[in-house]
Amino acid sequence: MLSRVCPTLRYNRIWSAHAREMPRATLLLLQPNFFHSSPKTALVNRLDVTSSEFSSMFRRSFHALRSTVGDWRKLPKPPGQVFAERREYRKIRRRAPKKKQELELSVSICIEEQLPDDLEIQNIAEMLRLNVPMAMTLAFNGLKDSKYKTRETDIEDLGGYETVELSVMLCNDDFICKLNKEWRGEDHATDVLSMSQHVPELKLPVLMMGDLVISVETAARQAAERGHTLLDEIRILVIHGLLHLLGFDHEISDEAEQEMEEEEELLLKNLGWKGKGLIQSAYDIQKTTTVQPEKSDDRKEGDGLRLYKPKFSYIFCDMDGTLLNSKSQISEANAKALKEALLRGLKVVIATGKSRPGAIRILKTADLTGSDGIISESSPGVFVQGLLVYGRQGKEVYRGNLDRDVCRETCLYSLEHRIPLIAFSQDRCLTLFDHPLVDSLHTIYNEPKAEIISSVDQLIAEADIQKVIFMDTTEGVSSVIRPYWSEATGDRANVVQAQSDMLEIVPPGTSKGNGVKMLLNHLGVSPDEIMAIGDGENDIEMLQLASLGVALSNGAEKTKAVADVIGVSNDQDGVADAIYRYAF
């Protein structure tokens, strides 16, 4: 399992007939000149390539480079210094100091054609396109002042290179088994092969490191054994293979194994990637079981790729008090976790008391909107406490309206006591008078700016109302408004409190849980496939419905009482913590 192809095997990579190539990742878009030249030196003006063919699965070739030398033509000197001499001094133009060219890291990610067009594999390949250059940078930095005694030092000083090239291929067990047998004489699948292309004798400005070949099938089995995701395992294999290309080899001695293990653990820690290094993980497995190499001939014909899938298909997430912090902002950590969930194939659905425009407005700041985000006007979602449910292509699945008599009574109460009220009507917010708290619903909570309607009758006739919100102090809501309306509405409406300074009046039977249930029926998804995250009393039914309900620690006591687990608070990136802890 912990093996590699000997670094002295040199070959010309020909992936095109066997693989799909992802877009190349380039940290710095610098176009290197293949050869440097100056008037004081001979010019390399031609590059000839000769090849020596040998039998190979890839039809690889050894290459030798030879160059021919051309002479610089001497040009006549320009008629300079004429005016300078008349002024009896020479005018010298100082050359600007030559800027040090930064190293360009060029990474190709390939998917072997026999792998299925699986979304998870494609997402992992896209993650590697970003991750591998980061790992290379840290690994190169680790070579500086390195005290390792067993590492081959063919790759030492990177200052003489302009570009570093590396290719990573994801394949199945059959592919890597054939490669392993051909190059190493071992007829079994392995997890990663490191195939160097670096020739120290050739003084080129391009460091061609070679290829990392990773079996997704073997990686998936190891991920399941070790209790982490397929992406985590492939990242570990990338680190292991990269260190082999940099001259580490755990097979030559105990000291070499210890040095490579230390470097693996250090890189994984500095990158913030999960899991132990491959060497340490192998020893952990050996303590509990002895794993025999699996020969390709022993596998049943037709066995498909067995991936380590995420634990859930969907994540339903509340916004206020959950995804958003106490300043009604989404943190960078929460946004990053949601994006990674999407890359891993999970679908994220917003279930909130907010209107759809309000949710879109705030999530747009974190680049989470649109067709590749978690919310748009053409994506599923549960809004206004489950009273507006949108399904595929954003089409309305359900709309619930508040009783008109209840609407009228709440409006009259608002005018009489001068307590601000906001009525939600699909994508609009309506109110009867201007008030700072009404403005805060737009400026702080990002809801649509409330339209002031001149009379109660006009507001009732304006449109169907899904819910109304009273806004007051926390004490005013808890001691006056809530007790009054809990009794006044009877069975005509429900009283819901998502925020301590707001009270919502909604149609009877309204809950996010019902909205989520209707959306699941529309999508054909079982509640067993979902994880839900919330904090308020309006999230209770949703958390109870989900296979795993996570209440954040800042949530209501009633909500935490019904949750399966209690996470950290919304000001501590509770959503990100829950996703990394329970969803992956």
From Swiss-Prot:
GO terms for molecular function: metal ion binding; metalloendopeptidase activity; RNA endonuclease activity. Pfam families: Hydrolase_3 (PF08282), YbeY (PF02130). It comes from the Eukaryota. Keywords: Chloroplast, Endonuclease, Hydrolase, Metal-binding, Nuclease, Plastid, Ribosome biogenesis, rRNA processing, Transit peptide, Zinc. Its EC number is 3.1.-.-. Signal peptide: none annotated. One of its GO terms (cellular component) is chloroplast stroma. Zn(2+) binds at residues 240, 244, 250. One of its GO terms (biological process) is chloroplast organization. Its cofactor is Zn(2+). It is found in: Plastid, Chloroplast stroma. Residues 1-50 form a transit peptide. It is an enzyme of class 3 (hydrolase). Disruption phenotype: Seedling lethality. Binds 1 zinc ion. Endoribonuclease required for chloroplast ribosomal RNA (rRNA) processing and essential for normal growth and development. May be involved in maturation of both the 5' and 3' ends of 16S, 23S, and 4.5S rRNAs. Cleaves chloroplast rRNAs, mRNAs and tRNAs in vitro. Belongs to the endoribonuclease YbeY family. NCBIfam families: Cof-subfamily, HAD-SF-IIB, rRNA maturation RNase YbeY. This is Endoribonuclease YBEY, chloroplastic. It comes from Arabidopsis thaliana (Mouse-ear cress).
